[in-house]
Protein backbone atom coordinates (compact mmCIF):
# COMPACT_ATOMS: atom_id res chain seq x y z
CA UNK A 1 0.00 0.00 0.00
CA UNK A 2 1.29 3.43 -1.01
CA UNK A 3 0.02 6.52 0.82
CA UNK A 4 0.59 10.02 -0.56
CA UNK A 5 -0.48 13.50 0.52
CA UNK A 6 0.85 16.88 1.52
CA UNK A 7 2.86 17.51 4.68
CA UNK A 8 0.78 17.14 7.84
CA UNK A 9 -2.10 15.55 5.92
CA UNK A 10 -2.04 12.59 8.30
CA UNK A 11 -0.11 9.96 6.34
CA UNK A 12 2.22 8.90 9.14
CA UNK A 13 -0.52 9.26 11.76
CA UNK A 14 -2.74 6.84 9.86
CA UNK A 15 0.14 4.40 9.42
CA UNK A 16 1.04 4.59 13.12
CA UNK A 17 -2.54 3.86 14.18
CA UNK A 18 -2.77 0.98 11.69
CA UNK A 19 0.54 -0.47 12.87
CA UNK A 20 -0.50 -0.22 16.52
CA UNK A 21 -3.83 -1.94 15.86
CA UNK A 22 -2.02 -4.71 13.95
CA UNK A 23 0.35 -5.09 16.91
CA UNK A 24 -2.50 -5.30 19.44
CA UNK A 25 -4.19 -7.93 17.27
CA UNK A 26 -0.94 -9.90 17.01
CA UNK A 27 -0.44 -9.74 20.77
CA UNK A 28 -3.96 -11.02 21.44
CA UNK A 29 -3.66 -13.77 18.81
CA UNK A 30 -0.35 -15.06 20.17
CA UNK A 31 -0.93 -14.67 23.89
CA UNK A 32 -1.66 -17.77 25.95
CA UNK A 33 -3.61 -15.62 28.41
CA UNK A 34 -6.84 -13.71 27.83
CA UNK A 35 -5.37 -10.22 27.48
CA UNK A 36 -8.32 -8.57 25.71
CA UNK A 37 -9.43 -7.09 29.03
CA UNK A 38 -6.06 -5.41 29.43
CA UNK A 39 -6.72 -3.29 26.34
CA UNK A 40 -10.38 -2.56 27.08
CA UNK A 41 -9.88 -1.12 30.57
CA UNK A 42 -7.99 1.73 32.27
CA UNK A 43 -7.62 3.60 28.93
CA UNK A 44 -4.67 1.34 28.17
CA UNK A 45 -5.25 1.17 24.42
CA UNK A 46 -5.11 4.91 23.86
CA UNK A 47 -2.36 5.46 26.45
CA UNK A 48 -0.02 2.96 24.78
CA UNK A 49 -0.83 4.29 21.30
CA UNK A 50 0.07 7.83 22.38
CA UNK A 51 3.19 6.76 24.25
CA UNK A 52 4.66 4.41 21.67
CA UNK A 53 4.02 6.53 18.58
CA UNK A 54 4.56 9.89 20.31
CA UNK A 55 1.07 11.26 19.69
CA UNK A 56 -0.04 13.98 22.09
CA UNK A 57 -3.58 14.95 23.12
CA UNK A 58 -3.92 17.31 20.14
CA UNK A 59 -4.29 14.30 17.84
CA UNK A 60 -7.56 13.33 19.52
CA UNK A 61 -10.91 15.04 20.07
CA UNK A 62 -14.45 14.19 21.13
CA UNK A 63 -15.14 13.43 17.45
CA UNK A 64 -12.26 10.94 17.09
CA UNK A 65 -13.38 7.56 15.84
CA UNK A 66 -11.12 4.56 15.14
CA UNK A 67 -12.57 1.46 13.53
CA UNK A 68 -10.17 -1.40 12.81
CA UNK A 69 -11.31 -4.56 11.04
CA UNK A 70 -8.45 -7.03 11.30
CA UNK A 71 -7.89 -10.63 10.30
CA UNK A 72 -9.38 -12.10 13.46
CA UNK A 73 -10.75 -9.26 15.57
CA UNK A 74 -12.16 -5.74 15.44
CA UNK A 75 -11.19 -2.68 17.49
CA UNK A 76 -13.43 0.34 18.09
CA UNK A 77 -12.38 3.52 19.87
CA UNK A 78 -14.15 6.87 20.21
CA UNK A 79 -13.36 10.18 21.90
CA UNK A 80 -10.32 11.80 23.51
CA UNK A 81 -9.73 9.44 26.43
CA UNK A 82 -11.61 6.25 26.95
CA UNK A 83 -11.56 2.52 26.47
CA UNK A 84 -11.43 0.54 23.27
CA UNK A 85 -13.92 -2.18 22.42
CA UNK A 86 -12.23 -5.31 21.09
CA UNK A 87 -14.29 -8.13 19.60
CA UNK A 88 -12.92 -11.47 18.48
CA UNK A 89 -14.34 -12.85 15.24
CA UNK A 90 -16.12 -16.21 15.28
CA UNK A 91 -13.16 -17.98 13.69
CA UNK A 92 -10.60 -16.46 16.07
CA UNK A 93 -9.55 -19.67 17.85
CA UNK A 94 -8.72 -21.67 14.74
CA UNK A 95 -7.48 -18.83 12.53
CA UNK A 96 -5.20 -16.88 14.86
CA UNK A 97 -1.54 -16.76 13.88
CA UNK A 98 1.81 -15.14 14.61
CA UNK A 99 3.22 -12.34 12.48
CA UNK A 100 6.41 -10.28 12.49
CA UNK A 101 5.85 -6.53 12.54
CA UNK A 102 8.21 -3.58 12.18
CA UNK A 103 7.70 0.18 12.01
CA UNK A 104 10.61 1.86 10.22
CA UNK A 105 10.51 5.57 11.12
CA UNK A 106 11.84 8.55 9.19
CA UNK A 107 14.43 8.98 11.96
CA UNK A 108 16.04 5.64 11.07
CA UNK A 109 19.28 7.31 9.98
CA UNK A 110 19.99 8.10 13.66
CA UNK A 111 21.17 4.48 13.83
CA UNK A 112 24.21 5.58 11.80
CA UNK A 113 24.36 9.34 12.32
CA UNK A 114 24.79 9.15 16.10
CA UNK A 115 27.56 6.97 17.47
CA UNK A 116 26.41 4.51 20.13
CA UNK A 117 22.82 5.66 19.69
CA UNK A 118 21.62 2.68 21.69
CA UNK A 119 23.38 4.17 24.71
CA UNK A 120 22.82 7.87 24.05
CA UNK A 121 19.11 7.87 23.12
CA UNK A 122 17.18 8.26 26.32
CA UNK A 123 13.43 7.80 26.44
CA UNK A 124 11.44 7.92 29.66
CA UNK A 125 9.16 5.27 28.17
CA UNK A 126 9.58 2.86 25.30
CA UNK A 127 8.62 4.63 22.06
CA UNK A 128 8.83 3.86 18.34
CA UNK A 129 12.41 5.10 17.97
CA UNK A 130 13.65 3.29 21.06
CA UNK A 131 11.97 0.13 19.77
CA UNK A 132 13.55 0.50 16.32
CA UNK A 133 17.00 0.88 17.88
CA UNK A 134 16.34 -2.25 19.94
CA UNK A 135 15.11 -4.22 16.91
CA UNK A 136 18.07 -3.03 14.83
CA UNK A 137 20.43 -4.71 17.26
CA UNK A 138 18.58 -7.99 16.65
CA UNK A 139 18.20 -7.55 12.88
CA UNK A 140 21.84 -6.85 12.03
CA UNK A 141 23.15 -9.98 13.74
CA UNK A 142 23.14 -12.39 10.75
CA UNK A 143 24.96 -10.07 8.33
CA UNK A 144 28.57 -10.85 9.14
CA UNK A 145 31.73 -10.90 6.98
CA UNK A 146 30.68 -14.35 5.82
CA UNK A 147 27.13 -13.20 5.02
CA UNK A 148 27.19 -9.56 3.85
CA UNK A 149 23.97 -7.97 2.65
CA UNK A 150 23.98 -6.14 -0.68
CA UNK A 151 22.23 -2.80 -0.21
CA UNK A 152 19.70 -1.44 -2.68
CA UNK A 153 21.54 1.74 -3.65
CA UNK A 154 23.92 2.89 -6.33
CA UNK A 155 27.62 2.50 -5.58
CA UNK A 156 27.80 -1.23 -4.97
CA UNK A 157 27.68 -1.16 -1.15
CA UNK A 158 27.13 -4.12 1.14
CA UNK A 159 26.31 -4.04 4.83
CA UNK A 160 28.45 -5.97 7.32
CA UNK A 161 28.05 -6.26 11.08
CA UNK A 162 31.61 -6.30 12.44
CA UNK A 163 31.41 -7.30 16.08
CA UNK A 164 28.44 -4.98 16.57
CA UNK A 165 29.81 -2.12 14.45
CA UNK A 166 27.90 -1.11 11.31
CA UNK A 167 30.23 -1.12 8.30
CA UNK A 168 29.63 -0.46 4.60
CA UNK A 169 31.85 -2.37 2.19
CA UNK A 170 32.34 -1.39 -1.45
CA UNK A 171 32.77 -3.96 -4.21
CA UNK A 172 36.52 -3.34 -4.18
CA UNK A 173 36.71 -4.15 -0.48
CA UNK A 174 37.01 -0.60 0.86
CA UNK A 175 35.32 -0.32 4.25
CA UNK A 176 33.53 2.73 5.64
CA UNK A 177 31.96 2.89 9.11
CA UNK A 178 28.29 3.80 8.73
CA UNK A 179 28.88 6.87 10.92
CA UNK A 180 31.02 8.39 8.15
CA UNK A 181 28.80 7.33 5.24
CA UNK A 182 26.64 9.64 3.13
CA UNK A 183 23.17 10.63 4.35
CA UNK A 184 21.63 8.44 1.65
CA UNK A 185 23.50 5.35 2.78
CA UNK A 186 22.69 6.14 6.41
CA UNK A 187 19.00 6.17 5.47
CA UNK A 188 18.91 3.13 3.20
CA UNK A 189 21.09 0.85 5.35
CA UNK A 190 18.75 0.31 8.34
CA UNK A 191 15.64 0.23 6.14
CA UNK A 192 16.95 -2.30 3.62
CA UNK A 193 18.60 -4.56 6.20
CA UNK A 194 15.57 -4.46 8.50
CA UNK A 195 13.12 -5.21 5.68
CA UNK A 196 15.20 -8.18 4.57
CA UNK A 197 15.55 -9.52 8.11
CA UNK A 198 11.87 -9.16 9.00
CA UNK A 199 10.63 -10.85 5.83
CA UNK A 200 13.22 -13.63 6.17
CA UNK A 201 11.69 -14.52 9.54
CA UNK A 202 8.49 -15.78 7.90
CA UNK A 203 8.25 -19.54 8.27
CA UNK A 204 10.76 -19.60 11.13
CA UNK A 205 10.29 -20.10 14.86
CA UNK A 206 8.79 -17.10 16.63
CA UNK A 207 10.38 -15.49 19.67
CA UNK A 208 8.47 -17.24 22.44
CA UNK A 209 9.39 -18.56 25.86
CA UNK A 210 9.34 -22.29 26.55
CA UNK A 211 6.30 -21.79 28.77
CA UNK A 212 4.44 -20.02 25.96
CA UNK A 213 5.34 -22.77 23.50
CA UNK A 214 4.10 -25.46 25.86
CA UNK A 215 0.84 -23.61 26.51
CA UNK A 216 0.22 -23.09 22.79
CA UNK A 217 0.85 -26.77 22.06
CA UNK A 218 -1.70 -27.69 24.76
CA UNK A 219 -4.51 -25.49 23.54
CA UNK A 220 -4.30 -25.08 19.77
CA UNK A 221 -5.67 -28.47 18.65
CA UNK A 222 -3.53 -28.95 15.56
CA UNK A 223 -3.17 -25.26 14.75
CA UNK A 224 -0.22 -24.58 17.05
CA UNK A 225 2.31 -24.13 14.24
CA UNK A 226 0.51 -20.95 13.16
CA UNK A 227 1.47 -19.33 16.45
CA UNK A 228 4.82 -21.03 16.95
CA UNK A 229 6.14 -19.85 13.57
CA UNK A 230 5.79 -16.47 11.88
CA UNK A 231 3.12 -16.75 9.19
CA UNK A 232 3.57 -13.29 7.70
CA UNK A 233 5.58 -10.06 7.83
CA UNK A 234 4.16 -6.55 8.10
CA UNK A 235 6.34 -3.51 7.44
CA UNK A 236 5.38 0.13 7.89
CA UNK A 237 7.93 2.48 6.30
CA UNK A 238 8.08 6.26 6.37
CA UNK A 239 9.45 7.85 3.19
CA UNK A 240 11.64 5.10 1.69
CA UNK A 241 13.07 7.70 -0.73
CA UNK A 242 14.66 9.69 2.08
CA UNK A 243 18.01 11.25 0.97
CA UNK A 244 18.23 9.00 -2.08
CA UNK A 245 19.05 9.68 -5.73
CA UNK A 246 16.22 8.61 -8.11
CA UNK A 247 18.15 5.53 -9.31
CA UNK A 248 18.59 4.40 -5.71
CA UNK A 249 14.90 5.04 -5.04
CA UNK A 250 14.11 2.60 -7.84
CA UNK A 251 16.46 0.00 -6.39
CA UNK A 252 14.95 0.42 -2.91
CA UNK A 253 11.38 -0.09 -4.10
CA UNK A 254 12.37 -3.19 -6.06
CA UNK A 255 14.29 -4.56 -3.08
CA UNK A 256 11.29 -4.05 -0.79
CA UNK A 257 8.96 -5.79 -3.23
CA UNK A 258 11.48 -8.61 -3.68
CA UNK A 259 11.55 -9.14 0.10
CA UNK A 260 7.76 -8.97 0.27
CA UNK A 261 7.41 -11.61 -2.44
CA UNK A 262 9.61 -14.03 -0.49
CA UNK A 263 7.46 -13.52 2.59
CA UNK A 264 4.25 -14.05 0.61
CA UNK A 265 5.60 -17.31 -0.79
CA UNK A 266 6.70 -18.67 2.60
CA UNK A 267 3.79 -17.60 4.79
CA UNK A 268 0.28 -18.96 5.16
CA UNK A 269 -1.07 -15.46 5.85
CA UNK A 270 -0.93 -12.20 3.91
CA UNK A 271 2.29 -10.21 4.29
CA UNK A 272 2.25 -6.50 3.48
CA UNK A 273 4.31 -3.33 3.21
CA UNK A 274 2.77 0.09 3.81
CA UNK A 275 4.80 3.16 2.77
CA UNK A 276 4.24 6.89 2.91
CA UNK A 277 5.96 8.89 0.19
CA UNK A 278 6.32 12.27 -1.49
CA UNK A 279 8.38 10.84 -4.34
CA UNK A 280 7.08 10.65 -7.93
CA UNK A 281 9.91 8.19 -8.60
CA UNK A 282 8.60 5.76 -5.99
CA UNK A 283 5.15 6.00 -7.54
CA UNK A 284 6.53 5.48 -11.04
CA UNK A 285 8.46 2.36 -10.05
CA UNK A 286 5.38 0.91 -8.34
CA UNK A 287 3.43 1.52 -11.54
CA UNK A 288 6.06 -0.31 -13.59
CA UNK A 289 5.80 -3.28 -11.21
CA UNK A 290 2.02 -3.12 -11.42
CA UNK A 291 2.14 -3.21 -15.23
CA UNK A 292 4.59 -6.12 -15.11
CA UNK A 293 2.26 -8.01 -12.76
CA UNK A 294 -0.65 -7.61 -15.17
CA UNK A 295 1.49 -8.80 -18.09
CA UNK A 296 2.47 -11.90 -16.07
CA UNK A 297 -1.14 -12.57 -15.09
CA UNK A 298 -2.10 -12.55 -18.77
CA UNK A 299 0.67 -15.12 -19.40
CA UNK A 300 2.40 -12.80 -21.85
CA UNK A 301 6.19 -13.04 -22.26
CA UNK A 302 8.23 -10.14 -20.86
CA UNK A 303 11.86 -9.54 -19.92
CA UNK A 304 11.52 -5.94 -18.71
CA UNK A 305 11.15 -6.66 -15.00
CA UNK A 306 12.74 -9.52 -13.03
CA UNK A 307 10.18 -12.07 -11.90
CA UNK A 308 11.45 -11.90 -8.32
CA UNK A 309 10.08 -8.32 -8.16
CA UNK A 310 6.60 -9.16 -9.43
CA UNK A 311 3.72 -9.76 -7.03
CA UNK A 312 -0.02 -10.03 -7.66
CA UNK A 313 -1.54 -6.86 -9.09
CA UNK A 314 -4.29 -7.20 -6.48
CA UNK A 315 -1.65 -6.76 -3.77
CA UNK A 316 -0.86 -3.22 -4.95
CA UNK A 317 -2.96 -0.27 -3.80
CA UNK A 318 -2.61 3.45 -3.28
CA UNK A 319 -4.40 6.28 -1.51
CA UNK A 320 -4.19 10.06 -1.45
CA UNK A 321 -5.09 11.92 1.76
CA UNK A 322 -6.54 15.29 0.82
CA UNK A 323 -6.46 18.54 2.79
CA UNK A 324 -9.60 17.48 4.71
CA UNK A 325 -8.02 14.18 5.73
CA UNK A 326 -10.24 12.15 3.41
CA UNK A 327 -8.78 9.07 1.70
CA UNK A 328 -9.10 8.86 -2.06
CA UNK A 329 -8.34 5.65 -3.94
CA UNK A 330 -5.77 6.55 -6.62
CA UNK A 331 -5.90 3.23 -8.46
CA UNK A 332 -7.09 3.75 -12.03
CA UNK A 333 -8.56 0.37 -12.90
CA UNK A 334 -8.95 1.16 -16.59
CA UNK A 335 -5.25 1.66 -17.34
CA UNK A 336 -4.43 0.32 -14.57
CA UNK A 337 -1.97 2.43 -12.57
CA UNK A 338 -1.67 4.55 -9.45
CA UNK A 339 -2.36 8.17 -10.32
CA UNK A 340 0.39 10.55 -9.29
CA UNK A 341 -1.49 13.72 -10.23
CA UNK A 342 -1.98 14.71 -6.60
CA UNK A 343 1.71 14.13 -5.92
CA UNK A 344 2.98 16.48 -8.60
CA UNK A 345 1.37 19.87 -8.27
CA UNK A 346 4.53 21.68 -9.35
CA UNK A 347 5.00 20.60 -12.99
CA UNK A 348 2.08 22.67 -14.28
CA UNK A 349 3.42 25.72 -12.45
CA UNK A 350 6.92 25.11 -13.86
CA UNK A 351 5.64 24.73 -17.44
CA UNK A 352 3.46 27.82 -17.17
CA UNK A 353 6.20 29.92 -15.57
CA UNK A 354 8.87 28.87 -18.09
CA UNK A 355 6.49 29.61 -20.96
CA UNK A 356 5.74 33.11 -19.67
CA UNK A 357 9.41 33.87 -18.94
CA UNK A 358 10.44 32.65 -22.41
CA UNK A 359 7.86 34.96 -23.93
CA UNK A 360 9.49 37.85 -22.09
CA UNK A 361 13.03 36.75 -23.03
CA UNK A 362 12.35 36.15 -26.70
CA UNK A 363 9.64 38.72 -27.37
Give the residues covered by each predicted segment.
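Phosphate-binding glycine-rich loops of NTP-binding sites
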Residues: 2-46, 183-198, 254-255, 272, ...
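Phosphate-coordinating catalytic segments in nucleotide- and nucleic-acid-processing enzymes
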Residues: 22-237, 307-313, 317, 324-363
